[in-house]
């Protein structure tokens, strides 16, 4: 916890995650919501477009927004392509980004790391802000030391645009760090329908499910002779992500580098 007032701008404040982030900013005494970034509604107040008491102005131009409001932190909850632009712009303005969008390549991350070093400020990119999901990934990495046979099933609402999810991909990356590369399944298996065995990350199979009624869920299934281990996390609403957003906003004020993944700021 910090007593310092942290001035924040929220990009994507009218989205499902953004609305929860606005509530978080309103309910956190040391957060001050100074503006929102949106593709429309320039010059209006947040209270004009969503159910909130916030009078924060809405901007459509990120450069103007950051210059006029001088925030400490940009919370970006937009789309992968917009998020990439916003993250770079924020760093160029000396504003610390906390990013909940996915789709950053290794080249993107390298460029952002260089920017954080040049500016001497932090940046946190989190494929998943739910603390339970982060612990699931950490537990999966631990289990992979003993269970090399593993598959991942991630399940999300049918409005999600990317597959696999950032959490699913990040889980596979973490497991691959400790697991010897191995193609999962029978070496001679054949897919009767292309894609039936899911995506392949270093031999780890990832399966993506998209259905209405779901929010964000993931199972990591391990198997060996005579036993299986399942590690599962479920987010039943988007409020579940706000503890991670709050932690990230507080922590980004005290770091001077790029952090990819909430697991790197949770002991």
Swiss-Prot record:
Q: Which Gene3D superfamilies match?
A: Dihydrodipicolinate Reductase, domain 2, NAD(P)-binding Rossmann-like Domain
Residue positions of the active site: 156 (proton donor/acceptor), 160 (proton donor)
Task: Tell me its EC number(s), please.
Answer: 1.17.1.8
Q: Which EC class is the enzyme in?
A: oxidoreductase
* Binding of NAD(+), residues: 12-17, 38, 100-102, 126-129
Q: Which Pfam families match?
A: DapB_C, DapB_N
Record key words, sorted: Amino-acid biosynthesis, Cytoplasm, Diaminopimelate biosynthesis, Lysine biosynthesis, NAD, NADP, Oxidoreductase
- Main localisation: cytoplasm
Q: Where does (S)-2,3,4,5-tetrahydrodipicolinate bind?
A: 157, 166-167
Annotated localization: Cytoplasm
GO MF: 4-hydroxy-tetrahydrodipicolinate reductase; NAD binding; NADP binding; oxidoreductase activity, acting on CH or CH2 groups, NAD or NADP as acceptor
Which biological processes are named by the entry's GO terms? diaminopimelate biosynthetic process; lysine biosynthetic process via diaminopimelate
The reaction(s) annotated as catalysed by this protein in its Swiss-Prot or TrEMBL entry are:
(S)-2,3,4,5-tetrahydrodipicolinate + NAD(+) + H2O = (2S,4S)-4-hydroxy-2,3,4,5-tetrahydrodipicolinate + NADH + H(+); (S)-2,3,4,5-tetrahydrodipicolinate + NADP(+) + H2O = (2S,4S)-4-hydroxy-2,3,4,5-tetrahydrodipicolinate + NADPH + H(+)
InterPro entries named among the record's database cross-references: DapB_C (IPR022663), DapB_N (IPR000846), DapB_N_CS (IPR022664), DHDPR_bac (IPR023940), NAD(P)-bd_dom_sf (IPR036291)
* Pathway of action: Amino-acid biosynthesis; L-lysine biosynthesis via DAP pathway; (S)-tetrahydrodipicolinate from L-aspartate: step 4/4
Q: Give an example GO cellular component term for this record.
A: cytosol
Entry's family note: Belongs to the DapB family.
Briefly state the protein's biological role. Answer: Catalyzes the conversion of 4-hydroxy-tetrahydrodipicolinate (HTPA) to tetrahydrodipicolinate.
User: Can you say what this protein is called?
Assistant: 4-hydroxy-tetrahydrodipicolinate reductase
Originating species: Bacillus pumilus (strain SAFR-032)
